[in-house]
């Protein structure tokens, strides 16, 4: 596993323009409802007197039949990347583009190349986001735990960011592979993560999307080769500057972000969530739905009673409490975290091995969504023409130029005709989620696969069909061997099969029966931090 091209929408929450601080609002605006929140101990009423968030309307810059060669995202012409590098296998894929292994032709040194589709950049803010990401990577260059940018290049179709190759895989994968680790090791990893936060803040940068997936190892055998990647949501900030756009990932988002009044303190909260997961294997704020997670974050209750917390040191729990303090002004700064006794050099974090159950939970935490995603694909592929006739009609109605693909503008206009009240950012989120091949448009097959979340998933006959696909021998149970065969068929080789079985298998017989399968499919998709067609599209499909 190498550098991954993380989706800017798949793993994020979007409420408004994610690149604009409060004081930079433009005169042309639209009104969006505030995030629902219960009463909390911390009073933010003075900071949030308006009942609604006012955000700028994005000005589109990309249109069908526009010659993309006539403008530069980077603002200037660059050398042809293929004159300097050889691009080879794909390392990862996200909503904006794909990351490839690339080799410097002159030196033979391997790098990672994140290629961003210019067709995805549908507004001026999108272009500014890419420019800012590159600027921030250059600005932070030189820190030993931040991925190093080599250069940025542009051609008629893509912006290419060449950066240091992190071939050691994700932080969590390394922990799982190790089989056990101690509080001391968790303290060492936390020191690296918070050190990145301190470096960013000292240089006037707020990361805004810290999470374990955004930390990769350069060398799988060296835990200290950890590097922060993906600065796509990062912004420059000035002391005292207030931001109110809701960005991040559900498990890791700070309460003040949900309340749309925040600054760099939110990064410390997120680092505290990561620390809690490192020590327990589960996030501190948990629910079956995204709104439930948000409510838990705003409530702020931290569980230190259930296993393994009774055997975790008091010093570790003290640090977590101070990092997950609901009041940003009372929360530790990154510098103060690094001075805490549990984390500092020769600190008090014990070297006692943590409960193996923590590792098990980590594996289960990462495995569930892979099976669910595979099952959704199976359902999409099993639908008959009769079942999708209504969806085909909807697709054809949206595809106004009969090109066989829906553009952003066509999707926006089509949803309006069907009664949708979604914001532009939410519509863009849906489009990015549905556009599997990153073409900048949604083709027919992608549209069907996405819209089955609306009106097909809960149909029992389709759940039966999907279950039968996995139940190869028709025994009424999905076994680990059958699951392995299905994973191979779908090219999913990095799945922890035993943990999928364990998580779904409610009666502990080592198999998944139909009722357990249905329960998994109907369970809130809590591990995915993006809006989906199912939970975002505010239209009725009964007559479609």
Curated annotation (Swiss-Prot):
Region (Disordered): 1-47
Keyword field: ATP-binding, Calcium, Cell membrane, Kinase, Lipoprotein, Membrane, Metal-binding, Myristate, Nucleotide-binding, Nucleus, Phosphoprotein, Repeat, Serine/threonine-protein kinase, Transferase
InterPro entries registered for this protein in UniProt: CDPK_Ser/Thr_kinases, EF-hand-dom_pair, EF_Hand_1_Ca_BS, EF_hand_dom, Kinase-like_dom_sf, Prot_kinase_dom, Protein_kinase_ATP_BS, Ser/Thr_kinase_AS
SMART domains: EFh, S_TKc
Residues the record marks as active site: 209 (proton acceptor)
Binding locations of Ca(2+) 1: 399, 401, 403, 410
Sequence positions bearing Phosphoserine: 249
Domain EF-hand stretches: 386-421, 422-457, 458-493, 497-527
GO molecular function: ATP binding; calcium ion binding; calcium-dependent protein serine/threonine kinase activity; protein serine kinase activity; protein serine/threonine kinase activity
EC main group: transferase
Activity control note: Activated by calcium. Autophosphorylation may play an important role in the regulation of the kinase activity.
Superkingdom to which the source organism belongs: Eukaryota
Positions bound to ATP: 91-99, 114
UniProt keyword annotation of Protein biosynthesis present: no
Ranges of Basic and acidic residues composition bias in the record: 8-25
Tissue specificity note: Expressed in both guard cells and mesophyll cells. Expressed in the shoot apical meristem.
A Pfam family of this chain: EF-hand_7
Lipid positions (N-myristoyl glycine): 2
Reactions listed under catalytic activity: L-seryl-[protein] + ATP = O-phospho-L-seryl-[protein] + ADP + H(+); L-threonyl-[protein] + ATP = O-phospho-L-threonyl-[protein] + ADP + H(+)
Occurrences of domain Protein kinase (ranges): 85-343
Binding positions for Ca(2+) 4 per the UniProt entry: 505, 507, 509, 511, 516
Function: May play a role in signal transduction pathways that involve calcium as a second messenger. Functions in abscisic acid (ABA) regulation of guard cell S-type anion- and Ca(2+)-permeable channels and stomatal closure. Phosphorylates FD.
UniProt record similarity statement: Belongs to the protein kinase superfamily. Ser/Thr protein kinase family. CDPK subfamily.
Protein name per UniProt: Calcium-dependent protein kinase 6
Organism per entry: Arabidopsis thaliana (Mouse-ear cress)
Gene: CPK6
């Amino acid at each position: 596993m190498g550098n991954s091209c993380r989706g800017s929408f798949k793993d994020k929450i979007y409420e408004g323009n994610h690149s604009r601080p409060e004081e930079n609002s433009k005169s042309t605006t639209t009104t969006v409802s505030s995030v629902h929140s219960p009463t909390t101990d911390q009073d933010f009423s003075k900071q949030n007197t308006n009942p609604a968030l006012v955000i700028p309307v994005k000005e589109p810059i990309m249109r069908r039949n526009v010659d993309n060669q006539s403008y530069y995202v980077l603002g200037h012409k660059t050398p042809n990347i293929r004159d300097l590098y050889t691009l080879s296998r794909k390392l990862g894929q996200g909503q904006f583009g794909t990351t490839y292994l690339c080799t410097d032709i002159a030196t033979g040194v391997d790098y990672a190349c994140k290629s961003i589709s210019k067709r995805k950049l549908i507004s001026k803010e999108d272009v500014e986001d890419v420019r800012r990401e590159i600027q921030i990577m250059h600005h932070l260059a030189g820190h030993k735990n931040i991925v190093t940018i080599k250069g940025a290049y542009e051609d008629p179709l893509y912006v290419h960011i060449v950066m240091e190759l992190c071939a050691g895989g994700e932080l969590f994968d390394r922990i799982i592979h190790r089989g056990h680790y101690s509080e001391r090791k968790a303290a060492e990893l936390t020191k690296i993560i918070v050190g990145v936060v301190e470096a960013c803040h000292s240089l006037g940068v707020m990361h805004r999307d810290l999470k374990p997936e955004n930390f990769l190892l350069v060398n799988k055998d060296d835990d200290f080769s950890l590097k922060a990647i993906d600065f796509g949501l990062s912004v420059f900030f000035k002391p005292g500057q207030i931001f109110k756009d809701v960005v991040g990932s559900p498990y890791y988002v700070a309460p003040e972000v949900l309340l749309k009044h925040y600054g760099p303190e939110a990064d410390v909260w997120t680092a505290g969530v990561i620390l809690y997961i490192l020590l327990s294997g589960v996030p501190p704020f948990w629910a079956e739905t995204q709104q439930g997670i948000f409510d838990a974050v705003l409530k702020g209750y931290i569980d230190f009673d259930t296993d393994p917390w009774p055997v975790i040191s008091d010093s570790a729990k003290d640090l977590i409490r101070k990092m997950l303090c609901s009041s940003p002004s009372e929360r530790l700064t990154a510098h103060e975290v690094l001075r805490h006794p549990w984390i500092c050099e020769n600190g008090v974090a014990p070297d006692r091995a943590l409960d193996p159950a923590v590792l098990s939970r980590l594996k289960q935490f990462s495995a569930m969504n892979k099976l669910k995603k595979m099952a959704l694909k199976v359902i999409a592929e099993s639908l008959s023409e009769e079942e999708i006739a209504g969806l085909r009609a909807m697709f054809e109605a949206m595809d106004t130029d009969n090109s066989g693909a829906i553009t952003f503008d066509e999707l926006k206009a089509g949803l309006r005709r069907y009664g949708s009240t979604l914001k532009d950012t939410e519509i863009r989120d849906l489009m990015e989620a549905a556009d599997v091949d990153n073409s900048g448009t949604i083709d027919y097959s992608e549209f069907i696969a996405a819209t089955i979340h609306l009106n097909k998933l809960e149909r029992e006959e389709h759940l039966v069909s999907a279950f039968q696909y996995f139940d190869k021998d028709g025994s009424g149970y999905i076994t680990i061997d059958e699951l392995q065969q299905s994973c191979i068929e779908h090219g999913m080789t990095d799945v922890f099969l035993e943990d999928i079985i364990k998580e779904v298998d409610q009666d502990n017989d080592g198999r998944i029966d139909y009722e357990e399968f249905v329960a998994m499919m109907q369970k809130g998709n809590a591990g995915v931090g993006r809006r989906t067609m199912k939970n975002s599209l505010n239209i009725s499909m009964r007559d479609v």
